[in-house]
Amino acid sequence: MAQVRKAHPKDLAAIARLSHQTLFLGREGPKVFPSETLWGALFVAPYLEAGCCNLVAEEEGRVVGYILGACADRPLALAFAKRLLWALPRLLLGRFGPPLPHLRYLLRLLRYPGPKAPKDRYPAHLHIAVDPEAQGHGVGKALLAAFLKCLREKGVPGVQLATTRANRAARGLYRAMGFRVYAKRASPFWAPYLGRPLIHEVWVRDLE
């Protein structure tokens, strides 16, 4: 049975590995963003530095799931900007492998942002992933329950998360945990990788 605990900076590599493995619609992501190290530096480390209620699920000493959260956007944005300034020169010099696929992904993030819910009502957001081998055993539910409890204790009024209509298992979990779809729209973000656009959704949960 997996045990949920607070995430620490020492968990960076384990979280980055799992996050990178599942970034492509819950499946392996190296063809989308080849460097696991760069992924961790840009999309995991800022949460461990400036996020809130970060959690991991461990089973026999191995991280099998995580939630990375933020209670507000500004501290996270500053932490991300700092990491990006560090990473860009190294990326262009080829330190993380061929620059083009990484730059392509980053530019598409800027060009095709997903729908958002109002930040005054839903200031917090989260990212969650569970190792495919550990799915179906309540790991995601345990992580989300602990995360929502942490947000309530901090007085956060609401939380939002992003997913796609294609991520059926995750959508079922979110619905079971009291989330609902707030907004959705077709997005071409994944089209170069899948050959078609996907419906991007923002889900919300009120905590008051």
Question: Where do the PLM segments sit?
Answer:
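Conserved beta-strand in the GNAT
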Residues: R62-C71
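A short beta-loop-alpha structural element at the N-terminal edge
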Residues: Q3-R17, E28
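Conserved GNAT-fold acetyl-CoA-binding loop/helix
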Residues: L23-L42, A79-L88, G97
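Conserved catalytic-core motifs of GNAT/GCN5-like acyltransferases
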Residues: R74, F80, A162, R175, ...
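Conserved acyl-donor/pantetheine-binding loop and adjacent beta-alpha core of acyl/acetyltransferases
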Residues: D73-H127
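Conserved GNAT acetyl-CoA-binding A-motif
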Residues: Y122-A124, L151-T163
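Active-site rim helix/loop that mediates acceptor-substrate recognition in acyltransferases
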Residues: V32-N54, R111
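Conserved acetyl-CoA-binding loop-helix of GNAT-fold acetyltransferases
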Residues: G136-C150, G172-A176
